[in-house]
Amino acid sequence: MSIINSKISTNSAEFVANAEAMQVKVDDLKTTLAHIFKGGGIKSCERHVSRGKLLPRERVEGLLDPGSPFLELSALAAHDVYGEEVPAAGIITGIGRVSGQECVIVANDAT
């Protein structure tokens, strides 16, 4: 693979400031996604489990081929849209491998 040369100075004050600002945004996104991936809150998840049900992300994980990746498509759906939290708009959507085949996966999240 050929190398693409750049005139960007990674030591310049502008580059460093932009990199720091970007890192703040990346950290905020990771925090938001971690919160979303917890589902609808502790009480809702406990109620779901007490009924003998798997949590939605556990269902998706169990469906996927072991060790295969899952490309989630709509984790930020409904984020900051309503007055109350609706993690991922109550639905998990993505692309994953099931029995060796790439599949679109949809799981409703009732938590």
Give the positions of each predicted feature:
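Terminal-region recognition feature
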Residues: 1-111
